């Protein structure tokens, strides 16, 4: 998919989408900070951009209103719901994003019901050579969190970054990033601290690195992370490494995850440039 443009006014965005539908071109709207217009068939990109230029000259032209009447969407196509916060959560997160969030919450509840150690025996990185073929352990450590702040912080970033990746690049891409970063960040962390660790932060740092570099090198991907946030991520790594806050942090997982995300973004953007 290709992002064509963004509109601050959702009604204007809907008018353009409706008009293009009457011309046989299917566009979709994704609501984020603005109304982003996406085109599935990239072979029609030049035609859409030419129509967009004409539309921007006079968006109030009667033919655009007529197109909205024809499609039955003169109300901008938006639904004003009683729970906008929940709607925002749902709109930004795809099935993989939600599945991981639910898994983390369920595991957190289990840890509070039966105790951290009991759950860690089930899900932790292999802590005995006899467990090395229990392959789920190389990934399930990401679901364990040890405080309310720990899980809230990680899930907020996971929803913000993972949801964007899934919505823009697909569930498959998010799965690949998650699996690779969980495996490699876990491997590095167990070298630092042993097998008794947990949390989604290694994957979150991979997503930070991926989204930031992908946005810098491939703006057309539609994902980005403000430079101030990537600087915050780096400062947080430094703070954890120097133990400024007296908190136990998975520093190895953070660094490994960030490197994994940057490397994957570099490879993906390199391949994208070769194709063009």
UniProtKB/Swiss-Prot annotation:
It comes from the Bacteria. It is found in: Cell inner membrane. Its main location: membrane. It catalyses: Cleaves type-1 transmembrane domains using a catalytic dyad composed of serine and histidine that are contributed by different transmembrane domains. It is a multi-pass membrane protein. Rhomboid-type serine protease that catalyzes intramembrane proteolysis. HAMAP family: Rhomboid_GlpG. This is Rhomboid protease GlpG.
